[in-house]
Amino acid sequence: MSDTLNQLAEVLEARKNAAPDSSYVASLYHKGLNKILEKVGEESVETILAAKDAAASGDCSELIYETADLWFHSLVMLAALGQHPQAVLDELERRFGLSGHAEKAARPKS
């Protein structure tokens, strides 16, 4: 895993026990999972809108910025639920080389 993701995972874990007024992430943890999920949803919408703008303008700088926000808040969500970013990378690695149809067919039926 990249050094950046590892370092970020360590910081996110450390912020779980920090005072809410000490950092943005600590304040999110203090507000609870629903607030974190709200931020993930907000950043998802902003990323989609930035992609539409990038397609029209050819400038992807805002798309990259918003995608970083989405990834960051997704990592906060994972950490709040006790998951490390490596779990997502492991899942992507598991899927690598599978066709989309084969991956979908292999999913458990619910």
UniProtKB/Swiss-Prot annotation:
InterPro entries found in the cross-reference section: HisE, PRib-ATP_PPHydrolase-like
Family membership: Belongs to the PRA-PH family.
Catalyzed chemical reaction(s): 1-(5-phospho-beta-D-ribosyl)-ATP + H2O = 1-(5-phospho-beta-D-ribosyl)-5'-AMP + diphosphate + H(+)
Lineage: Bacteria, Pseudomonadati, Pseudomonadota, Gammaproteobacteria, Pseudomonadales
GO cellular component entries: cytoplasm
Gene Ontology MF, one: ATP binding
The keyword Hydrolase belongs to this UniProt entry's keyword annotation: yes
Designated name of the protein: Phosphoribosyl-ATP pyrophosphatase
This enzyme's EC code(s): 3.6.1.31
Main location (coarse class): cytoplasm
An individual GO BP term: L-histidine biosynthetic process
